[in-house]
A protein has these predicted regions:
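Charged, terminal alpha-helix-loop-beta segments
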Residues: 1-163
Length: 163
């Protein structure tokens, strides 16, 4: 049976000493609950999975594409989305990625984006928000629980032995 194996990309930095030591490998995540060093690394990882057709967040999503439009770093009159995705029924998903937990305004931001997209871009389809971050606080968890349009995910890095 097949198992998903998650890989953590490593960032190489050359060691500039005279003995030509091997480059030091620095993980792209830090320990503090395990988090990505930048939102771009998290976004790259998620984009790779969506482009490969992998089911993410328990929903079969693909990155939004229309003539002249692509859903990564999607710019619209109210701001810029990390990722705009859609499900097989054409419902839209606004995905906001945060590398850690210090974003108290994430819920409010996504709620405003959902309202704008529902009014201007949904064409009768539904619009949902997904917030993905490390270690969400209780206030964010409660806000999302009260809003059927939102889902909250905590990312985790795991390793599985292949036998």
């Amino acid at each position: 049976r097949s198992r998903d194996v998650e890989k953590v990309r490593a960032i190489s930095s050359a060691d500039e000493n005279e003995n030509n030591a091997e480059p030091e490998m620095k993980p792209a995540i830090e320990r503090k609950g395990v988090q990505f060093q930048s939102e771009k690394v998290l976004e790259d990882e998620l984009t790779m999975r969506l482009e490969a057709g992998m089911e993410v967040f328990g929903i079969p999503l693909k990155i939004y594409r229309r003539r002249g439009e692509y859903g990564r770093q999607y710019i619209f009159p109210e701001g810029r989305l990390d990722i705009l995705a859609e499900d097989p029924d054409g419902n839209l998903y606004i995905i906001e990625l945060k590398k850690d937990s210090g974003y108290d305004d994430a819920y409010k931001q996504i709620a405003q984006y959902i309202d704008w997209f529902q009014k201007h871009k949904a064409n009768g389809k539904k619009v949902y928000g997904i917030i993905c971050l490390n270690a969400p606080d209780k206030a964010l968890i409660e806000a999302v629980r009260q809003d059927d349009r939102m889902k909250l995910f905590e990312y985790q890095i795991s390793y599985s032995e292949i036998r």
